[in-house]
UniProtKB/Swiss-Prot annotation:
Protein name, per record: SPX domain-containing protein 4
Chief location category: membrane
Keyword Membrane tagged: yes
Gene assigned in the entry: SPX4
Function as written in the Swiss-Prot or TrEMBL entry: Inositol polyphosphate sensor that associates with transcription factors to regulate Pi starvation responses. The SPX domain provides a basic binding surface for inositol polyphosphate signaling molecules. Interacts with PHR2 to inhibit its translocation to the nucleus and repress its DNA-binding activity, and then negatively regulate Pi signaling.
Effect noted on mutating Y25F: In PBC; loss of inositol polyphosphate binding
Length: 320
């Protein structure tokens, strides 16, 4: 299944409040498809009033500057939402930890019955389960949007003959929405609290958060999963995360051709083994310099192929 279909399927399954916060992948594809052949930026009205290029230089450069502005607006949207959610999770986790301490402090004598204490702890567990699921979903939000951005940049370069992919991808890798180390620490902190308070629940959640091992499940399997039986709200988060993981799994497939910007490179190590994490800034095996080196290698290979073809056309012997 193509990435666009997977991306659309994920949007249909994700939390309703999140749907308009994702990369406008479909709209950007249409925009690229309708780019004029002369290399000039389309009218401002055709791109939701995005400022056009200066238009006082090479048409390709002006078009590249204009499209970069379009993508800048998308990056701003992604960053704003990601930062907002991450800050909310920091606050929410602190509130839950304080709530746990209060429950512990009044355990001996403050509760009228054991059932009241159990109910309070179950409410805390539910809150942890939901926030854990949403943080995992935010990690996949980062991965899918970055993957979509890479796809869009490739389509733009192919359509226009531009060279926007490499510099813009490098820039995107340093944006807040792609810097997931703080979020990963929050996930681990949440799992540590769950393991301490609810060992069985923690095992279930840690298994679900392992993107390298998570596989799509059918309806029968999901109906028997412990995480799907907590309640409707928790199930919505769980289902949304599964949909995101399914889309990411399609990106893990190794490419048949070498490409420094191939999404499979962000999902596999140098030895070809799948990485355990999503496409995030934590996948630091591919630094800016390595991508540049890979680009140089590609140019050298292309140059050799051109020389070989020219020699063959001239009837000269082919260098081995």
């Amino acid at each position: 299944m193509k990435f666009g279909k997977d991306f659309r399927s994920h949007l249909e399954e994700t939390l309703p409040a999140w749907r308009d916060k994702y990369l406008a992948y479909k709209s950007l594809k249409k925009l690229i498809k309708n780019l004029p052949p002369d290399g000039d930026p389309p009218p401002v009205a055709a791109a939701a009033e995005v400022p056009a290029g200066d238009g006082d230089g090479d048409g390709g450069i002006a078009l590249g500057n204009w499209f970069a502005r379009v993508l800048d607006m998308e990056l701003q949207k992604l960053n704003d939402f990601y930062i907002e959610r991450e800050e909310w999770y920091v606050i929410r986790l602190q509130v839950l930890k304080e709530r746990i301490e209060r429950v512990k402090a009044k355990k001996n004598g403050a509760f009228t019955s054991k059932s009241e204490f159990t109910e309070e702890m179950l409410e805390i567990r539910k809150a942890f389960v939901i926030i854990h699921g949403e943080m995992i979903l935010l990690q996949t939000y980062s991965s899918l949007n970055f993957a979509g951005l890479v796809k869009i940049l490739k389509k733009y370069d192919k359509r226009t003959g531009g060279l926007l992919s490499l510099p813009f991808t490098q820039r995107a890798r340093h944006q807040p929405f792609f810097t997931t180390e703080p979020l990963t620490r929050l996930v681990r902190e949440c799992e540590a609290n769950l393991e301490l308070l609810f060992p069985i629940e923690a095992e279930v959640l840690e298994s679900a958060s392992s993107s390298a091992k998570l596989q799509p499940q059918n309806d029968d399997a999901a109906s028997h999963d412990p995480a799907s039986s907590v309640d409707v709200e928790t199930s919505d988060v769980y289902r949304s995360t599964l949909a995101a993981m399914k889309a990411i799994q399609g990106l893990r497939k190794a490419s048949s051709t070498y490409n420094p910007l191939s999404l499979a490179r962000f999902f596999h190590g140098e030895d070809g083994e799948a990485c355990s994490g999503a496409i995030t800034s934590e996948s630091d095996s591919y630094s800016d310099s390595q991508i540049e080196d890979a680009e140089d290698d590609d140019k050298e290979v292309q140059s050799r192929e051109q020389n070989t073809a020219q020699n063959a056309a001239e009837g000269q012997p082919r260098d081995e």
